[in-house]
Amino acid sequence: DQMPPGMRETLYFKDDDSRLSFLQGNYVTLTNMSEHDIDRIVKYHLSPINISFQTMNPQLRCKMLNNRFAGEALKKVDKLFEAGITMNGQIVLCKGVNDGEELEYSIRELTKYLPCLESVSVVPVGLTKYREGLEPLQPFTKEDAKEVLAIIEKWQKVFYEEYGLHFIHAGDEWYRSPSLYQGT
C-alpha cells in the first residue's frame, strides 16, 4: 500500500497467498484464505507456512490490517497447529499500536503454538512517503528500539529456560538500520 505510482504492475501484486508462503517464503496474514485453502494445506501437509501475525489481539488485528475478518483469521492458525503444520511467524511492529504491553501479550499467546510455530521474528514497520489514506504512523526512535530489544531479550531468556530455544527473535533492522531512528 506504500508503493509509489508509475511502477511496473507486478510490484503492486498483493502477495498474501499461501502458495507463495510455502514456495517462496512470503508471509501471509491468512485473511483472504478460505477453509478450503486451509484444508488443502492440511491435506498435503504444506510446510512451513509463514504467518504475519502483527498481534494476537483480535480487535487490534482487525484495525491494523483494516479487515473486519482479521481477528477471526487467527482461528485458522489453530487448525494448522492441530494438524501439525510447521509455521514461522512475524510481528510487524508499529510504534504506539502493537508494541509494549501488546507485544508482550502477543508473545505469550504465540507460545501455545509451540512446537509447530518454530520461530517468530519482530520487525519494525517499513514506512515510506507514499502513505496517502493510511493510518499515520511514527518511526521508532533509538530509545524505542532499546525497549523493544529489552522485551525480546527478556522473553528469549524465559523461552530458553523453559523450552531450550529462543523462539522469538529481533529482526536485523532493530540493530542496523539508521533510517529506523529518524530524529535521533
Please annotate each region the language model reported.
Residues S52, V123, G171:
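Conserved residues at the C-terminal ends of beta-strands
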Residues D1-C116, G126-K154:
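Conserved Radical SAM active-site core
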Residues E143-T184:
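Hard-cation-handling environments
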Residues P124-L127, Y175:
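Residue-level detector of flexible, active-site-proximal loop/helix-junction positions
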